[in-house]
Structure formats: structure tokens, C-alpha cells
């Protein structure tokens, strides 16, 4: 059963990937990094492990993540950590940037051990790259670009590393979806300042409080901007279990 309040932001590094056929075939996971969020708050219950592969890493892959064969020589094999890893992610929503890459590798590793399990069977997988593409159509949406766009410090990211990338992705995800505090937590956020004002005041009261005497220029969104906004509201409404406050307060019939 999926726990909707528990999210694990996950990243992997590998020995390489294939340009043709299955991208994972013949390769191995060599690092897993994961950051746990419960009710959109960091718990500190993170996971990080290096794994000894059964083959050398490709030189091009080493240039990306900097993990050499010598660094992995004394690390456990995947079969030694597989069950603990499965227990850790079981029942969570996995947040992964370009999820098909990592999930493909994870399921491949499970199959090599004859484990009768697929990631989708025990987790809800959310691809944050697809989320970003919906929110920022036509723009670059890799982690570096998103950090620049959202004002997140990624200065420590000189090489790819699974735990560091998971930590950065957690920051990116929370910024893309409204911040660390859950907007829809009845006991905390709904009682907080801005949202409480939105609950107590009607749309007419808010409108009447605005001074229109200064002849401010009214900026209209483009069709592309409006569509991106609607897609964002759809995503927020889905994430909140159909509790999108914009929809509830102002009767936005476009959010479903």
C-alpha cells in the first residue's frame, strides 16, 4: 500500500548505458542516493550506498560521476543490499528525474537476482523531469537549469553524485510544488497566515481591498503561459487530492 505522505527522492549512478537497445542491459548500478520526505519535510532518514559491480565502468561514465573501479573494490554487491533497499522504498512515492532511466536499472538489477518484484509494484513513481517539462515548456529542464531558474544553490555539484543529486532534486521538487511546508496540511499550513486569509475572505472582499486608482498596467498572459499555468494547477490539484485552493476559492473550472 502506498503511503501518500512519504516521498523518497532518488538518484542512481551506473557503470554506463547503451545507446542502442535497452539502456541498462549489461550495466550495473554503482551508487544509490535517496532523501526521505514525510509531509513534505526532510526527515534525515536518507540512504546512500556504493555498490561493487560485476564489470568495469565505462570511461565516459567515470568522467560524469568520478567513481572509479578502485573506489568500488571493497563495496558490497547489489545482492547484499537489495532487500534493505526494497524495504526502504516499499510503499513510498519515488521522485526521480528522468525516472525511466533509474527505474529501468533498478528493475534490471532485481531481475538479475531473480527477485519477483518491479519498482512500480511497490512504489508510486513520479518523473520530476516530466513535471518540469509541463511547468516550463520549451525550456531546458535538467537539474542545473532548474536550480538556476528556481534560485537553488548547486555550487557543490562539480560531478554527478547520487546523494547530492537527490538532495538537490528534493529542493527543486519542493520549490516547484510550493515549498517545504505542505500547502494542504490542515493542522499546519491551512492555519498559516496567507492561506488563512484566503479562507476567511471572499473573492469580493479581496477584490475590494485593491486600490485601482493608480491606473496600473494590466499584463495579460500569452496563450502558452496560460496553458502552462493550467497544467500546473492540474498537477497541484492532483497532488493535493482535489484540494487545490485556487479552484475552491475562485471556482476555476479549468482545474480537474
From Swiss-Prot:
Its EC number is 2.7.7.7. CDD domains: DNA_pol_III_epsilon_Ecoli_like. A divalent metal cation 1 binds at residues 11, 13, 165. It catalyses: DNA(n) + a 2'-deoxyribonucleoside 5'-triphosphate = DNA(n+1) + diphosphate. It comes from the Bacteria. Its cofactor is Mg(2+); Mn(2+). It is an enzyme of class 2 (transferase). Binds 2 divalent metal cations. Magnesium or manganese. Keywords: DNA replication, DNA-directed DNA polymerase, Exonuclease, Hydrolase, Magnesium, Manganese, Metal-binding, Nuclease, Nucleotidyltransferase, Transferase. A divalent metal cation 2 binds at residue 11. One of its GO terms (biological process) is DNA replication proofreading. Substrate binds at residues 11, 13, 60, 65, 165. Coiled coil: none annotated. One of its GO terms (cellular component) is cytosol. SMART domains: EXOIII. One of its GO terms (molecular function) is DNA-directed DNA polymerase activity. The keyword rRNA processing does not apply. The active site is at residue 160. DNA polymerase III contains a core (composed of alpha, epsilon and theta chains) that associates with a tau subunit. This core dimerizes to form the POLIII' complex. PolIII' associates with the gamma complex (composed of gamma, delta, delta', psi and chi chains) and with the beta chain to form the complete DNA polymerase III complex. DNA polymerase III is a complex, multichain enzyme responsible for most of the replicative synthesis in bacteria. The epsilon subunit contain the editing function and is a proofreading 3'-5' exonuclease. This is DNA polymerase III subunit epsilon. It comes from Haemophilus influenzae (strain ATCC 51907 / DSM 11121 / KW20 / Rd). The lineage of its organism: Bacteria, Pseudomonadati, Pseudomonadota, Gammaproteobacteria, Pasteurellales.
Amino acid at each position: 500500500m502506498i503511503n501518500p505522505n512519504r516521498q523518497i527522492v532518488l538518484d542512481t549512478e551506473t557503470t554506463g548505458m547503451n545507446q542502442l537497445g535497452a539502456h541498462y542491459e549489461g550495466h550495473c548500478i554503482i551508487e544509490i542516493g535517496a532523501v526521505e520526505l514525510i509531509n513534505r519535510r526532510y526527515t534525515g532518514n536518507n540512504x546512500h550506498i556504493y555498490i561493487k559491480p560485476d564489470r568495469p565502468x565505462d570511461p565516459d561514465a567515470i568522467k560524469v560521476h568520478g567513481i572509479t573501479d578502485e573506489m568500488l573494490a571493497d563495496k558490497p554487491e547489489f545482492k547484499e543490499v537489495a532487500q534493505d533497499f526494497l524495504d526502504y522504498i516499499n510503499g513510498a512515492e519515488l521522485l526521480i528525474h528522468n525516472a525511466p532511466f533509474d527505474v529501468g536499472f533498478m528493475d534490471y538489477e532485481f531481475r538479475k537476482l531473480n527477485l519477483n518484484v518491479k519498482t512500480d509494484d511497490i512504489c508510486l513513481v513520479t518523473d520530476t523531469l516530466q513535471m518540469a517539462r509541463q511547468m516550463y515548456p520549451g525550456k531546458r529542464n535538467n537539474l542545473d537549469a532548474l536550480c538556476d531558474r528556481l534560485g537553488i544553490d548547486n555550487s557543490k555539484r562539480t560531478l554527478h553524485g547520487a546523494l547530492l543529486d537527490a538532495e538537490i532534486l528534493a529542493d527543486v521538487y519542493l520549490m516547484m510544488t510550493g515549498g517545504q511546508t505542505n500547502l494542504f496540511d490542515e493542522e499546519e499550513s491551512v492555519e498559516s497566515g496567507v492561506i488563512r486569509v484566503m479562507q476567511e475572505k471572499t473573492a469580493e472582499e479581496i477584490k475590494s481591498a485593491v486600490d485601482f486608482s493608480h491606473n496600473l498596467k494590466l499584463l495579460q498572459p500569452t496563450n502558452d503561459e496560460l496553458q502552462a499555468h493550467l497544467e500546473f494547477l492540474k498537477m497541484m490539484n492532483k497532488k493535493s487530492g482535489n484540494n487545490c485552493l485556487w479552484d475552491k476559492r475562485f471556482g476555476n473550472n479549468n482545474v480537474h
